[in-house]
């Protein structure tokens, strides 16, 4: 039952993050949909971690594959926060839209992190846990 509650909570927070992202694009005073390109970063961010968990050897304390995955994930997350700032600095979007998109980014990435904390705690990551 705890897995179901966690899944419902993660889905709710993901929906709230996407709502903030869409509000930053679709409100009448903003009306520009360029910030939706951060959706690409949402899709790309968990991929290095999935790959590193498949290829990792559990015998050593330092794992180069996992550290590279953390580095790539950090680059993807920083890029998703940088894109709205660059768009706002070039006057493509307004600063209010930038704030909404960045708040949505924070909520979505905390949701992705929460997914890994709740469902990825075992030795071998498995989709069968939920």
From Swiss-Prot:
Membrane-spanning residues: 7-27, 31-51, 68-88, 99-119
Superkingdom of the organism of origin: Eukaryota
A GO CC annotation given for this chain: endosome membrane
Main localization of the protein described in the UniProt heading: Golgi
InterPro entries: Vps55/LEPROT
Keywords: Endosome, Golgi apparatus, Membrane, Transmembrane, Transmembrane helix
Tissue note: Widely expressed.
Extent of the signal sequence: none
Subcellular location: Golgi apparatus membrane; Endosome membrane
Membrane topology listed for this record: Multi-pass membrane protein
Entry annotated with the keyword Endoplasmic reticulum: no
GO biological process, one term: late endosome to vacuole transport via multivesicular body sorting pathway
Keyword Secreted: no
Pfam hit, one: Vps55
Job of this protein: Involved in protein trafficking. May be involved in the down-regulation of membrane protein levels.
Family affiliation: Belongs to the OB-RGRP/VPS55 family.
Name of this protein: Leptin receptor gene-related protein
Organism: Takifugu rubripes (Japanese pufferfish)
Native organism taxonomy: Eukaryota, Metazoa, Chordata, Craniata, Vertebrata
